[in-house]
Amino acid sequence: MVKGKKLDETGETKKLSIRGKVNDMYSVYAIPLEYLYYNDQNGRINTAYKKYSSTNGLLSPEPGDSEYNMIFEKFIYESNEKAMKETKQSILDKLQQEPGVVLPDGRVIDGNRRLTALRMIARENNEDRRFNAIILPLYVKSKYDEKIIKELELDLQLGREERVNYDPIDRIFDVYNTIEVEKLMTIDEYLSLIHISEPTRPY
């Protein structure tokens, strides 16, 4: 839980355009890792989580060194070990360069690899590490906000060339889950957010 905590500002700001929000400049905070937890709705690791939950059941999100976070950390690491090692080395060499995005309850919307790298470094070196991130006043229990959160996730993780591409299976599952199961948006809305034209639909 981040809301209500006294957090240090880093002095940085991050520009982020969000539908329905007037302010697009947000202050960056140094957030203790124990306040944060992974996003169980993240499209990149949905297939890994579904496979796990089919045998072990669903997990309840918990911050800090919880079983939930340890399992999701493993999902993130194994989803792309090469990118994970590069992110970890980059943080060791130059600290965290790009702020993440966090919700008031501590859910990390953007920055899974950075969070994982920081958690691993803190654990291996017995160091106090902070996750630099902006805090968006959005709530996953609100259906309206849930759609905005998904739009933001797609824009940050899929709509920019420098991001590591989705695994094809994760992409297909995320499309199906977002459109058919959760009914958060239409196929055209999804495609526009990930910058794919009509002829190359994911399904």
Model-derived segments and spans:
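Short, charged amphipathic recognition helices of the HTH superfamily
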Residues: E182-S192
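Short, flexible helix-coil linker/hinge segments at the edges of structured domains or between repeats
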Residues: N125-F173
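Short, charged/polar connector segments at secondary-structure boundaries
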Residues: M1-R129
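Residues that form generic nucleotide/phosphate-binding pockets
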Residues: S90, D155-Q157, T178
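Single conserved hydrophobic/aromatic residue that forms the stacking wall/gate
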Residues: I194-Y203
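Short, amphipathic alpha-helical "recognition" segments used to contact nucleic acids or chromatin
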Residues: P168-L184
